């Protein structure tokens, strides 16, 4: 039986706008039955979200989004792991430490571009959670360096030059292994972002399947109908589960993305 679900969302525990409980309340208002909280490199908001889900009648799945080393746009979602997740926590601790070190170099990078903002203000924007690009973008907007969050990314935070500010990332195989070690399922997120021709994406999907990938995010707000059809074909070809997610961060962070939801069959997620 299918349920209306959104399996890719972010809260203020990483770079989203809403506290986990507030995110779940919005999901209930949007008519969602199942929500996965997939913050970047952290599960710190999960238990708050689960408690809110019981209050609002939304089933909340534990989740996480991990960036893989092979490509800056290769992201792996971990879904449906249990209340104990030592392998993922160990990996995420390493990833967060690398993010924490990189924030100093981001400030230096922006200063070289004439953007002078304080790290203290960025950390306040982050609310003590994982510091990520949207936090820098919000501060830049506040001080008038950009006219919109989109401009902050286009001019500064999503350029090839910015991407040379390195941080540690695990390989896709390591991400999948950590997710499996804690009883979860590994899903390729927003494949369109990889920007690969179909043949290359087919080869990458085959390699990821060989590493244990369980599913592919076929449904995503920025996928075209043609892309969605191709991803569904990849799922059939490689016996991958089909998921869908909005990648919702909040109206202030990604104004064009709302909590959506797709009719999905989720019996394969063991911790439902």
Task: Outline where the language-model segments fall.
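Conserved acidic, metal-coordinating active-site core of Asp-based
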Residues: 126-193
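Flexible, glycine/proline-enriched loop segments at strand-loop-helix junctions
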Residues: 89-98, 123-126, 162-163
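Charged catalytic cores and adjacent phosphate/nucleic-acid-binding surfaces used
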Residues: 1-11, 17-30, 44-66, 70-84, ...
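Conserved phosphoryl-transfer catalytic core
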Residues: 97-124
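Short active-site oxyanion
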Residues: 33-35
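Short, amphipathic alpha-helical segments
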Residues: 82, 93-104, 130
């Amino acid at each position: 039986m299918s349920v209306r679900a959104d399996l890719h969302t972010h809260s203020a525990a990483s770079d989203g706008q809403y506290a986990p409980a507030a995110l779940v309340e919005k999901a209930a208002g949007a008519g969602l039955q199942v929500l996965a909280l997939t913050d970047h490199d952290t599960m710190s908001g999960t238990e708050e979200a689960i408690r809110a889900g019981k209050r609002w009648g939304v089933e909340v799945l534990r989740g996480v989004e991990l960036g893989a080393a092979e490509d800056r746009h290769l992201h792996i979602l971990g879904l449906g792991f249990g209340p104990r997740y030592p392998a993922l926590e160990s990996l995420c601790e390493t990833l967060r430490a690398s993010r924490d070190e990189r924030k100093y170099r981001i400030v230096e990078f922006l200063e070289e571009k004439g953007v002078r903002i304080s790290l203290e203000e960025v950390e306040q924007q982050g609310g003590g959670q994982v510091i990520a690009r949207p936090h820098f973008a919000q501060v830049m907007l506040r001080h008038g360096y950009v006219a919109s969050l989109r401009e902050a990314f286009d001019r500064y935070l999503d350029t090839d030059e910015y991407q040379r500010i390195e941080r540690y990332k695990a390989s896709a195989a390591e991400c999948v292994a950590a997710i499996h070690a804690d009883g979860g399922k590994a899903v390729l997120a927003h494949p369109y972002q990889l920007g690969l021709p179909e043949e290359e994406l087919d080869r990458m999907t085959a390699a990821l399947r060989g590493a244990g990938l369980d599913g592919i995010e076929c449904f995503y707000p920025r996928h075209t109908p043609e892309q969605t059809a191709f991803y569904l074909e990849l799922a059939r070809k490689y016996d991958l589960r089909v998921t869908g997610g909005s990648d919702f961060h909040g109206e202030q962070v990604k104004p064009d993305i709302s909590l959506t939801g797709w009719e999905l069959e989720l019996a394969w997620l063991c911790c439902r």
